[in-house]
């Protein structure tokens, strides 16, 4: 019998993630450990993309990042982009729950260094600007395995850290805005897909757009500085018309 074709579902480029984390992460692991692991990861991924009949990734950015790692003496396998999806029967709007105009939500595994960096950026840079205008605004950090420094944010009465939850949807339904200030990353941000599927407006950075088909300004709000990011969050808080439109 002929050999069966072998497909590597890479999902994303880990070395591309590490390359960004080495310079931009706000966590010890993200900055120092990934810097140490980067050369080995680049070499491993470069060899892997030449070792299969087909390679799958979730975004064009990751495809291009992998192709750059191809050894000079080898030919890369075909790489196809297969974006992540979301279960629209599970993640959908819920008109029975009224959104709290002061609630902002962030979701993700809170031991993951990219998520830790995002939350630290939110707490240190974005939320102080939001609180100057809306002092009652609340940030809810939803996700399992929060590190001690993330848990410590809950000492602020305007910040909640949930840890593991059985169902993310109620937190998305009650929030006026989902925030994803991606400083570095790879692949598709599933947290954005889930929020959009529940009808929760998303404010994010331009780094997420290459993996999404959302239109900035009409389907998603985009800002790359703390001033601009907080301004977009404030645009949504208390503006039911805009919340409905995004």
Segments predicted by a language model, with ranges:
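Conserved acidic donor-binding segment of nucleotide-sugar-dependent glycosyltransferases
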Residues: 220-227, 235-240
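Conserved catalytic-core segment of nucleotide-activated headgroup transferases in glycan assembly
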Residues: 50, 68, 81-174
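Short Ser/Thr-rich beta->loop micro-motif in glycosyltransferases that lines
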Residues: 163, 180-185, 207-208
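Acidic donor-binding loop of glycosyltransferase active sites
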Residues: 53, 170-187, 198-201
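A short, active-site helix/loop in glycosyltransferases that binds the activated sugar's phosphate group
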Residues: 42-76
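Short hydrophobic beta-strand element within catalytic cores of glycosyltransferases
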Residues: 191-194, 201-205
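Short acidic/histidine- and often glycine-rich active-site loop of Leloir-type glycosyltransferases
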Residues: 206-217, 221-222
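Acceptor-binding helix/loop patch of EC 2.4 sugar-transfer enzymes
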Residues: 4-43
């Amino acid at each position: 019998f002929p050999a069966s074709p072998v497909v590597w579902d890479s999902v994303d480029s880990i070395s591309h993630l590490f390359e960004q984390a080495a310079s931009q992460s706000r966590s010890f692991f993200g900055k120092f450990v990934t810097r140490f692991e980067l050369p080995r990861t680049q070499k491993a991924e470069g060899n892997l993309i030449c070792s299969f009949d087909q390679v799958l990734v979730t975004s064009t950015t990751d495809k291009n990042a992998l192709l750059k790692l191809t050894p000079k003496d080898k030919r890369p396998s075909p790489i196809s982009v297969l974006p992540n999806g979301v279960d629209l029967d599970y993640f959908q709007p819920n008109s029975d729950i009224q959104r709290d105009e002061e609630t902002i939500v962030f979701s993700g595994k809170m031991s993951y260094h990219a998520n830790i960096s995002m939350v630290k950026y939110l707490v240190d840079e974005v939320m102080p600007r939001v609180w100057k205008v809306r002092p009652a605004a609340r940030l809810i950090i939803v996700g399992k395995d929060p590190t001690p420094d993330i848990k410590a944010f809950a000492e602020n009465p305007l910040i909640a850290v949930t840890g593991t939850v059985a169902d993310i949807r109620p937190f998305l339904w009650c929030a006026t805005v989902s925030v994803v200030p991606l400083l570095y990353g790879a692949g598709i941000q599933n947290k954005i897909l889930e929020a959009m599927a529940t009808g929760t407006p998303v404010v994010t950075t331009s780094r997420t757009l290459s993996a999404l088909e959302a239109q900035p300004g009409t389907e998603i709000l985009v800002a790359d500085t703390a001033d601009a990011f907080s301004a977009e969050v404030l645009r949504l808080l208390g503006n039911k018309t805009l919340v409905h439109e995004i």
